[in-house]
Design a protein with these regions (language model features):
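Residue-level recognition of beta-strand termini and adjacent short loop/turns
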Residues: 10, 102-104, 222
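Surface-exposed loop/interface segments of Gram-negative outer-membrane beta-barrel transport/assembly proteins
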Residues: 6-92, 110-213, 220
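A conserved hydrophobic secondary-structure block that centers on an alpha-helix together
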Residues: 1-5, 100-107
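Short, intrinsically disordered, charge-balanced linker/junction segments flanking boundaries
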Residues: 215, 222-226
Length: 226
């Protein structure tokens, strides 16, 4: 959902523009190996084997009954026996404020405040009998929450004046910008259906700050020369 407000105060000397948006996205990720498998698998081979092994899907097996290493796997099995999902929550908001001084209307003050926050977490489940993770007894783990944060502050003053007596106009701006980014991911382990760790991903914490100061002067004479 989203909301937008545009109030003004003090006889339009102060104008605000307020925006806020929130969202929840639920994602399902397919095993993309199914694309290659579908394009290369022998189309005359039946999808289902009629057996309980490998979830009932036909797979190339060796003399031990295990999937053949490097063989093309059943694309339908790759899709249906892989449950990978995530949920991402996000909020974006900003406020713009413009203020013209009552006693000095040629001077405008502006401020922008912005905030962007996202948090995501997910889970992966592949049953132990699936051919795609047969040697590791499947997968069963969760990860997250991964967090991203962005803050913005912009402040500037603008003076705009036309002096007809000397056929001149002045446009002066001075400002300041602050931006902050933060991205964090907690430590998590990929585990099989037996609770055994298969792989561990390290935690990460990245932060960046950007500061800017700026100024500008535009002068024009007789509406021709700048």
């Amino acid at each position: 959902g989203s909301i937008t407000l545009n109030p003004s105060f003090f006889k339009d000397h102060l104008k605000l523009n307020i925006n806020a948006k929130g969202s929840i996205n639920k994602n399902t990720f397919a095993n993309t190996s199914a694309i290659w498998a579908a394009s290369t698998m022998n189309p005359t081979i039946p999808v289902y084997s009629g057996l309980d092994t490998f979830g009932g899907y036909t797979e190339a097996i060796d003399n031990t009954g295990a999937p053949v290493n490097g063989a093309v796997m059943n694309p339908v099995g790759l899709l249906n026996m892989n449950d990978s999902q995530s949920t991402v929550k996000r909020f974006i908001g900003n406020i713009d404020a413009d203020y013209r001084l009552h006693f000095f209307p040629d001077l405008k003050l502006h401020a922008t405040l912005g905030y962007d926050y996202a948090q995501g977490k997910g889970s992966v489940y592949v049953p132990a009998e699936a051919a795609q993770n047969y040697t590791t007894s499947g997968l069963d783990y969760s990860y997250g929450p991964q967090k991203k944060e962005n803050r913005l502050l912009t402040l500037y003053a603008n003076y705009n004046k036309l002096v007809e007596s000397i056929k001149s106009s002045f446009d002066v701006t001075a400002g300041y910008d602050y931006q902050y980014w933060k991205s964090t991911t907690p430590l998590y382990s990929e585990m099989n259906t037996l609770g055994e760790i298969q792989k561990t991903s390290k935690a990460s914490d990245e932060r960046h700050v950007l500061l800017s100061y700026y100024g500008r002067l535009n002068y024009s004479f007789n509406s021709r020369y700048m």
